[in-house]
Regions:
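Secreted, disulfide-rich extracellular signaling modules
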Residues: 1-296
């Protein structure tokens, strides 16, 4: 069994009805509920893209010999910022938000813009923002806060999402939740669990060409949670992003079975025997352009 790790190429947290960009923040804070900090009621969603170039190269070069089969699996791993200390359970953050418990997060593919013919990929920029709110500082230019794209409304300076926030959680917009391609859903009982979404079918479909021009994925609370009313506070969960300066950078882990076993030591009559051919050129392994014919 071998492992290949693919890392994020960009990520951002977008905030309901807000132009704030947090692309450079080392933590994504997914929250819902009453929020006097940013909005009277709000929630956030996390978007990201993965650099699959090394994995694609390994598949094309035959290093990953399994092909896009069940022998190759892909899991998205993100570390919870509360994972390390159980004392964080049932407490609040420095901003006064309660740590969320008993909730589901789902992983979805960012859809194309279906208002164009043909539909066009919604290619978004990560942005240069850091803070979730503008700091009250006498410094004229707060370089940690930015309202430049991407954000809830815009993907670039001149382009917007087909639907603000990517989709409508009330199914009343130009692109709705019930039209999303949901990849996986995970339940969080205590709120300190790590993310481990299964992306096997999704990534294999990209590798075999079934999915073309992907522009990334998103993570969000279920619409029923985002739309909760009557809450007396804000509830949040945090995960490390690609900008963390720690070991806990998020990644896609690919596991593939490249164990080669044949019957060279048990080659007998009366059964199907398997042999592997190793081809060398100047002492190095070489891939063939076509299947060879061998006479025994």
């Amino acid at each position: 069994m071998s492992i290949n790790n693919s890392y994020f190429s960009r990520n951002n947290t977008i905030i309901y009805n807000d132009l704030t960009n947090t692309g450079r923040n080392p933590v994504t804070e997914l929250y819902y509920g009453e929020d006097g900090i940013v909005n009277p009621r709000g929630f956030s969603r996390f978007i990201f893209d993965i650099d699959l170039s090394l994995l694609i190269e390994k598949v094309n070069n035959g290093i990953v010999s399994t092909g896009c089969t069940s022998a190759m699996t892909h899991t998205l791993n993100m570390t919870n910022t509360s994972y390390f200390d159980k004392d964080f359970l049932n407490t609040s953050t420095s901003q006064g938000r309660y740590r969320a418990t008993s909730f589901d997060l789902f992983l979805f593919r960012i859809p194309p813009n279906n208002s164009t013919i043909p539909p066009t990929p919604q290619i978004w920029d990560e942005g240069v923002g850091y803070d979730f709110i503008s700091a009250n500082t006498p410094i004229p230019n707060d370089k940690n806060y930015s309202d430049r794209p991407s954000n809830w409304s815009a993907i670039t300076t001149i382009d917007t999402w087909e639907e603000p926030g990517i989709y409508s959680n009330t199914n009343s917009g130009s692109f709705n939740y019930n039209s999303l391609q949901v990849i996986d859903t995970q339940h969080f009982e205590f709120g300190d669990e790590n993310i481990d979404f299964d992306m096997t079918n999704e990534i294999n479909s990209i590798l075999n060409g079934s999915i073309t021009t992907p522009v990334g994925w998103g993570i969000a609370y279920l619409p029923q949670v985002e739309s909760l009313s009557g809450t007396t506070g804000t509830y949040s969960v945090g995960f490390f992003t690609r900008h963390t300066q720690t070991f806990y950078e998020p990644y896609l882990q690919t596991n593939y079975n490249d164990l080669i076993e044949d019957d060279r030591n048990m080659f007998v009559l009366g059964k199907i025997n398997k042999l592997y051919l190793y081809v060398y050129e100047d002492g190095d392994f070489k891939n063939l352009d076509f299947n060879p014919f061998v006479e025994l």
